Amino acid sequence: MQSKSIKIQGARTHNLKDIDIDIPKNKLVVLTGLSGSGKSSLAFDTIYAEGQRRYVESLSSYARQFLGQMDKPDVDVIEGLSPAISIDQKTTSKNPRSTVGTVTEIYDYLRLLYARVGRPTCPNHGIEISSQTVQQMVDRILEYPERTKLQILAPVVSGRKGEHVKILENLKQEGYVRIRVDNEMREVTDDIQLEKNKKHSIEVVIDRIVVKDGVASRLSDSIETALKLGEGNIIVDVIGEEELTFSENHACPICGFSIGELEPRLFSFNSPFGACPSCDGLGTKLEVDIDLVIPDWEKTLNENAIAPWEPISSQYYPQLLKSVCNHFGIDMDIPVKEIPQQQMDIILQGSGKEKIKFEYENDFGSIRRSEAPFEGVLKNVARRYRETSSDFIRETLEKYMAQKNCPTCKGHRLKKEALAVLINGKHISNVTDYSIVESIQLFQQLDLTEKEQQIARLILKEIDNRLEFLNNVGLDYLTLSRTAGTLSGGEAQRIRLATQIGSALTGVLYVLDEPSIGLHQRDNDRLIDTLKRMRDLDNTLIVVEHDEDTMLAADWLVDIGPGAGEHGGEIVASDTPQNVMKNEQSLTGKYLSGKEFIPLPTKRRKPNKRKIEVMGASENNLKNVSAKIPIGLMTVVTGVSGSGKSTLVNEIVYKSLAKSLYKGKVKPGKHKKIKGIEHIDKVIDIDQSPIGRTPRSNPATYTGVFDDIRDVFAQTNEAKVRGYKKGRFSFNVKGGRCEACRGDGILKIEMHFLPDVYVPCEVCHGARYNRETLEVKYKGKNISEVLELRIEEALEFFSAIPKIKRKLQTVYDVGLGYIRLGQPATTLSGGEAQRVKLASELHKRSTGKSFYILDEPTTGLHVDDIRRLLSVLQRIADNGDSVLIIEHNLDVIKSADHIIDLGPEGGDRGGQIIATGTPEQIAEQQDVSYTGKYLSPVLDRDKQRMEETLEAKTVSRS
């Protein structure tokens, strides 16, 4: 009998404390809890990992070696598991060949559609290319009314230069009488002189016919003769009316442009049969970018305005440039922007064939003279990039290059033959450039013949279904041609969700990781409906989620806690959402029921005169937007998914500030101007990328506190007696570390058909250091034991050393008291990594001129974590520094001093600023702002809660 639940006993993965739990099957189950409490350990590292492992175990050992090994999770028993599919945010392809269309398989169906009902059309003449039989040609001609006069012509020369004497002579010998030369009727016996260097057309008159009964067989004979002479092409000249062209070849009857047999691979940009030969189907080419070559047009040539020719290791290029400027009389002491265009063209594009006398003196004083044309800066960079075999030089030159649309295919990725196949006047790449919403309308309004409809019916059904699913998960603004690498984690996850629904599997266990990331409240209901639809197909959904709406919509809610890290890993509540709300032990329940909440700020900071002003932003879908970001405030940029928030903040504001402050080689998105940079001296982008990619990186090394701890150990009497400096206490360099494991503390043993086994080092037993180093102790602990301390314990341990205490205090303040000093960076979640970065910035002295940028910082955070994060961000703003956040979370939005709301919709229908002001001002603009619509009830609710809390406190005091 099929079990009704997934039974887990004795789960101990990571921080899970030997837990037992029953998870109901065929239900929407939400796992929640503080960041680091063990949600992912239970969902992904235990349940999914075991489901996946059991499937792989069923394969032969030969097949298993190709699949990579699955570790067996640390759990006693899991019963009732179904085949498991995980949809997380990390596994999206960054391959430039991957697009929304290919990931969702819609593009595969589109290729099939174009191969079956597409109409090849000559790109030069706009004529539909089709091969016809003689019978079809006769039938078409006989459609004309009786007494219609026409003549049948065989084209022997079509738009070719020459005198064509031989051809005319042959026609005379073969007995033909009339010909048409360049649209003029002539006799073959005439003296026809053609100009050698002009293009000519010659057609032979095969027959003159009047349409009447019984003419069909004569017409048929004449057409056959004409086809033979015209190599498969004929022209029917209807006297006084139109001209018809027929072809029995699959080619344009005028210019001969032909397409082979239509097959799906012709439309694939990942196949040599369909890909543009110039860019190999990528649609873009790496070209030298003038804005990166000359980043600052205010500089002069003598001030090294040309970045790739800066004299870093040699004076060769500056001397070459000087010779060019001397030859053409170019002033090297005026700003580059003032150099006349003609002279600038010589510097950038070269001198053509004109030779220049060039003199070069090397570092040893010897002089070399030569005379040669000047190739130009842009061609020089491109040539060196092409010809070098050095990875270092290639990487250096890449900084001056950018991806630009391929000039051959104009960014469409396909060869011209594929782009010549049309349906309703559009080629396949035109269709993929439509947004999902526009595509749905396009396919509903396709104008197909009855035969084409029959062929395309099933293909269109599949395409419509998949487009509808994408629309339902709030991705209506994406285009099918969008590359997968440019999608946010939430978008990529929802695309894969839509693909899974399209497959309509049943009896599957889906494990999802925060599918609501990057989704505006407006689209949340659609996502929840999608999840319920998957559940209704008899699937079990285990969703790791912090979103209130999703938790309340769940059939079953599991709260893991009570704290995070060492303080978590237990099941606090496992029940229906309604019962969890009544559970006094559950922190999540308290927030859901409103007993706990994030209060509104008692007062909001007022903007002063200082601001960063972006003018004329028009990158991606931004429509010439001008935005003002006040300095010293907490500003939140809001708007529905795809409205242009990331483009404005990450592509324009961050890159412009980084380029200006750090002379970075990044190219900001399109905008006219940015003002107010003088108000800041550093810009910090705090994202959720890992703080280090190896286990050697940890919170202690990242925040810099490990340096101070090593100083403390080096100052101990024992260390001084032994002559140990601080380097002795590093596990990254020889000296103090254990050389058997090179300071890793563990050894990896490869077990080909089984998972790799990691065992503690036999010499140091996981301590990372050699015996002599471990003999040095501070307050009874050696350096290895100190790295094992949790942040909260380390705070107590180093309370007498202000320098260390200050750095650790900030890590504790952002809610990471539970992580260990030496915890490998690879084991930290995205939210934890982001907070370590925040903490390492916080302990630095504030100048009031720092500008912090955070893109969806609430990802992976519980409401209680968000509360802590907000108090840290408010602290930054209290110091006079500026905070700019992209966010959908209403708790963050309601805490802002200033909001910039983009919209009104996503994609092409977005890209405008529709409202700015305080949260209260945005809430009043519900008619134009979706954010205002959802923010208004939250503000009212929290004001009421704050009043009730105040009353309760007053009553309890009295």
From Swiss-Prot:
Keywords: ATP-binding, Cytoplasm, DNA damage, DNA excision, DNA repair, DNA-binding, Excision nuclease, Metal-binding, Nucleotide-binding, Repeat, SOS response, Zinc, Zinc-finger. Residues 1-232, 315-593, 604-935 form the ABC transporter domain. It is found in: Cytoplasm. GO terms for biological process: nucleotide-excision repair; SOS response. It comes from the Bacteria. Forms a heterotetramer with UvrB during the search for lesions. Belongs to the ABC transporter superfamily. UvrA family. This is UvrABC system protein A. It comes from Oceanobacillus iheyensis (strain DSM 14371 / CIP 107618 / JCM 11309 / KCTC 3954 / HTE831).
